[in-house]
UniProtKB/Swiss-Prot annotation:
It comes from Candida albicans (strain SC5314 / ATCC MYA-2876) (Yeast). Its EC number is 3.4.22.-. The gene is ATG4. This is Cysteine protease ATG4. Belongs to the peptidase C54 family. Its main location: cytoplasm. The keyword Protein transport applies. GO terms for molecular function: cysteine-type endopeptidase activity; protein-phosphatidylethanolamide deconjugating activity. One of its GO terms (cellular component) is phagophore assembly site. It is found in: Cytoplasm; Nucleus; Preautophagosomal structure. It catalyses: [protein]-C-terminal L-amino acid-glycyl-phosphatidylethanolamide + H2O = [protein]-C-terminal L-amino acid-glycine + a 1,2-diacyl-sn-glycero-3-phosphoethanolamine. The active site is at 145 (nucleophile), 314, 316. Disulfide bonds: none annotated.
Length: 446
């Protein structure tokens, strides 16, 4: 009988070796399941992707009210129909190529995001090679979720304004350079100063809000596209609104509408419970356009809630670009829920008002419930030597104007510069994407 050698040391793998082996096993396991499922799918059996599992069936009459973009429902079927009527934009594959940046992410990095999604393979199996271009991005799977949720927010804003113009609205978001709100144009305007976002890099709320503003500003304010007039876009970075500025917009422009975007962070690792009721209030407002945000590593479009569960559309299902446009692919019967305690603190909130009376009504509702997120001021404070607070949101007129973090007043910046202090503190917002990727931050003072 062999005796154990007391001098022989057990073989212990390093942490890095163990992690590497685990990653390999995970990938191999996923690939095995993928091939098995693909084989079953090509033989006629398909499953709904896990990320798109629908909400569970409920009784027709529910005990708790469902709130969706300012509408209240006590009947599940009615709520379900309303949710399904909203526009849903998700990952797309096979769109007009977006050239990669020399020093940016490589398209091949996102190969797993496409190959491990059965729906993409089923719908485009014959043209599989066209999805994998080493020099160009032909899909945003794996990196474009914040862009897609921002498109969701903007598209449903336009749908509130023009409920009978759904086909015309969807045309504005087609994945090509000629469509005003395409992913191509989001990338184009975000590549400018101060963001410098490259194709394949993840957006955060700041980048998303500035991109929407720039794209809207490129269109003449009095110009209509297929009967659709694009609203004015304002960014309130630290959630301050000034009454006199809103009044000026409506006084100067007849039939104006204003989309106010709040790119905010409401906590460190998770949303502080202090803000829960305020988030629910903004979603319940009849002026709500929803929230683009999510949980860590993913961005979702939140459009309502039931009790403490937020209702959202998930953009992480890749669909193949179709010509002519398949309108059914811009609606989904599979929406999900997320408890507010799991919500990532970094988000972009949208509010739409179409006249000064609506703004006053929105303001009154916020003051009545003591909303902790939005703050109102009667007048814009002039920039003076004794000023400690600067205007907290500004309007971009063209590409040359910069996106300024107005949490720091100009006077404070000047004082810091006189004292030799740096004013280039990084933006506190984190990107909602794969956290292993590089984070695009916006400088506070540019």
């Amino acid at each position: 009988m062999n005796q154990p050698n007391p001098n022989k040391q057990p073989i212990v793998q390093s942490t890095s070796e163990q992690t590497s082996n685990e990653e390999v096993d995970t990938v191999l396991g996923r690939f095995t399941l993928f091939v098995k499922d693909l084989s079953n799918g090509l033989n006629g059996s398909q499953e709904v992707p896990p990320s798109q599992e629908s909400v569970s069936e409920e009784a027709e009459v529910i005990s708790r009210k469902i709130i969706v973009l300012g509408q209240t429902f006590d009947n599940f079927d009615n709520a379900n129909d309303y949710i399904e009527s909203k526009l849903w934009l998700s990952y797309r594959c096979g769109f007009e190529p977006i050239p990669k940046s020399i020093d940016g992410p490589q398209p091949i990095q996102f190969f797993p995001s496409i190959i491990f999604n059965r729906s993409t393979i089923y719908s485009n199996f014959a043209n599989l090679k066209s999805l994998f271009d080493k020099e160009n991005f032909t899909s945003d799977a794996g990196w474009g979720c914040m862009i897609r949720t921002s498109q969701n927010l903007l598209a449903n804003t336009l749908l509130k304004l023009y409920p009978k113009n759904e086909p015309e609205i969807v045309k504005l978001f087609q994945d090509d350079t000629s469509s005003p709100f395409s992913i191509h144009n989001f990338i184009r305007v975000a590549s400018l100063s101060p963001l410098h976002v490259k194709p394949g890099e993840w957006f955060g709320p700041n980048a998303a809000s500035l991109s929407i503003k720039r794209l809207a500003s490129e269109l003449l304010q009095d110009q209509e596209i297929d009967g659709i007039k694009i609203p004015r876009v304002f960014i309130s970075e630290n959630s301050d609104l000034f009454d006199d500025e809103i009044r000026d917009v409506f006084a100067k422009e007849k039939n104006a509408s204003v989309l106010i975007l709040f790119p905010i962070r409401l906590g460190i690792d998770k949303v502080n419970s202090y803000y829960y009721n305020s988030i629910f209030h903004l979603l319940a407002s009849k002026y709500s356009c929803g929230i683009a945000g999510g949980k860590p590593s993913s961005s979702f479009y939140f459009l309502g809630y039931e009790d403490t569960d937020l209702i959202y559309f998930d953009p992480h299902l890749p669909q193949v670009v179709e010509t002519p446009i398949n309108m059914d692919s811009y609606h989904t019967t599979n929406y999900n829920r997320l408890n507010i305690s799991l919500l990532d603190p970094s988000m972009m909130i949208g509010i739409l008002v179409t006249n000064i009376d609506e703004y006053i009504d929105f303001k009154t509702s916020c003051l009545d419930i003591n909303n902790k997120i939005v703050h109102f001021h009667p007048h814009t404070l002039p920039v003076q030597q004794d000023s400690i607070i600067n205007q907290s949101w500004e309007e971009v007129q063209d590409e040359e104007e910069e996106f300024i973090n107005l949490n720091v007043s100009k006077i404070e910046n000047e004082q810091q510069q006189e004292q030799g202090q740096s004013t280039d503190a990084p933006d506190e917002f984190i990107d909602i994407g794969n956290q292993s990727s590089s984070v695009v931050s916006v400088p506070s003072n540019v």
